[in-house]
Amino acid sequence: MTAPTTTSPSSEATTTTTTTTLNTIATLHQSLTTETTPLPVRFRALFSLKHVAATHPATSAESLAAIDAIAAGFASPSALLKHELAYCLGQTANGAAIPYLTAVLEDTGEDAMCRHEAAEALGALGDVASLGVLKRFRDREGEEVVVTETCELAVERIEWENGEGKKAEKLRASDFSSVDPAPPTAQGQEEQTVEELGNALMDTSLPLFKRYRAMFALRDLASPPDLPTAVPAVLALAKGFADSSALFRHEIAFVFGQLAHPASIPALTEALSNTEEASMVRHEAAEALGSLGDEEGVEETLRKFLHDAEAVVRESVIVALDMAEYEKSNETEYALIPEAQGTA
């Protein structure tokens, strides 16, 4: 006689948890892809999906469903949302995102800001199989400069990640968990000073990858904000807004958003207020100011640009004001993550 099949309580609990998470993903998917959903809610849904994708095993049903849900958002007409989708996919450390990102990069009719973010995300994922497509668009005649430069960085990052250089280098411990377009400058026997890193940051004779490394080294010297090097590092970074590369300038604004240091407010305000500045820089400056929303005068500055001529700037201000409200609230997590799943 065949013994009856039994299911252990632990496997039943796992199945129930998986089902609950998949149901949550479906709800978040709906919020993310519904154009009538307020943009801040869609962003919070996106960050929740990124959390699920990054905190579950890469081949799990939950992680794959979350990545599929994020990628479904690429059908949106919002360049701001699509570029954020690409960034989030690059932060998942999951190769399942690569086909979606490759498709965005290869779509020459797509907004250059989205394609740049897709290339950067491929670099963050670090798969050598992506080198071919990245080199193709790095070298493509007539390509948008922002895409060319990003592909150059992504190729260098993947080669560094998979080469001997990474193994031999000693990197300063960072307060930031993000996978960046370049690692910080490696530490030598003596740590480089803010002045030395600032000089490297602005040295246009250096490869872009090395300048980015100086940028992220300066970022790490500015956190926590009470470090003696923090304000000097922020001021050194702010000089990067004078660079000729819009990609470089936008990355300075992104770093300021990570740092949320009050000393960056004047430079960010100037970048946002300059209507001659590239929209990808202004939008990043707006979002960075959103991370400083509890500082005096920041919300008033942002509200001035709610009706900006550039859609990506207008939308960024909406999201930034939502972030500012979060900064002033008692909420512990910006994303819409159910309590049962924990927080990042």
From Swiss-Prot:
Transmembrane segments: none annotated. Gene3D superfamilies: Leucine-rich Repeat Variant. It is found in: Cytoplasm; Nucleus. Keywords: Cytoplasm, Hypusine biosynthesis, Iron, Metal-binding, Monooxygenase, Nucleus, Oxidoreductase, Repeat. Pathway: Protein modification; eIF5A hypusination. The lineage of its organism: Eukaryota, Fungi, Dikarya, Ascomycota, Pezizomycotina. Catalyzes the hydroxylation of the N(6)-(4-aminobutyl)-L-lysine intermediate to form hypusine, an essential post-translational modification only found in mature eIF-5A factor. The keyword Membrane does not apply. This is Deoxyhypusine hydroxylase. HEAT-like PBS-type repeats lie at residues 81-107, 115-140, 210-240, 248-274, 281-308.
